[in-house]
Amino acid sequence: MIRFLRFTLVVSFVFATAFSRPLCRAAAAAGDDDAVLQADHAFVQALAKADAAAASKFLDAEFSWTDSAGATQSRAEVLKSFPKPVLGDESDAEVKERTYGDVGTVMAARGKVHVLRVWVKRPAGWRALVYHEVTQLDQPPTAAGSGVNDCENPCKTVPFQPKNEAERAIIAAWQALETGVTAHDAEAWSLHVADEFVQISSNNDHPIDKAGRIATINKQKQSGAGSAPPPLVSAHMLDFGDAVVMICLHQPYTGKPIHVTRVWIKRDGKWIMSISFQTTIQAAPAKAG
């Protein structure tokens, strides 16, 4: 399910629209949207008040926090000293929520600053799995693409061993869409992406939806610009039925590495990408061209 709201209206809006919200074809149990939003709101308020005791109750065992500089901390590291959330209490932020079965996602934004929080349904309730910040560029990027025409990694091989059929299918879908990007084949790319797809990158100045990404691929085709994606360095998948969270490290052909959180969903029998948040790791050395 997909919903759009501001936190200042969470409680009243949730119940006022409980029977009128639009549906995603990915299954979501009745009430899960409300439960995700309520947990998320309480978590954000605890963070804004620097209430570590309250905030810690929401953290999943696999929790990770990535800030706008690309620094990532584990649950244990966060518990030692909670980071300061870039959007504060988010009272003036635009918030979008989507629930995919046992995975809930909340995206908050104010201007160029974006935050993704991924929630997972555990026996004890909804728990925060990922907190990922992105601060976008003030101006459009100067490069039209990577400038590279050949794609070995990730199009043909990846340094990752899937542990089950779902992960194998996701890798195959991902390789197919990245092959489409490299070949400037927008149709091939679009087959593996959800209609509600969004990409938020610290290497761009605005969010990119499905139509926007297709337009970029077509422009690169017209110009002949090399557009091979950045090779994968490492990946970790967390499986939750018909939704999988994929956390990756990429090293572009030039520049600094990128921390990426992707959400994959199984819809109409196939795996497609729904969300991609990408943050450059500022403290890492840059690769020379």
Regions found by a protein language model. Give the residues of each.
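Short, low-complexity N-terminal intrinsically disordered segments enriched in polar/charged residues
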Residues: L23-A61, L129, T135-L191, D195, ...
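Bacterial N-terminal signal peptides
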Residues: T8-R21
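Short beta-strand edge/turn micro-motifs at domain boundaries
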Residues: H114-C155, P257-A284
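Hydrophobic pocket/interface hotspot
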Residues: F43, A54-A55, F63, V78, ...
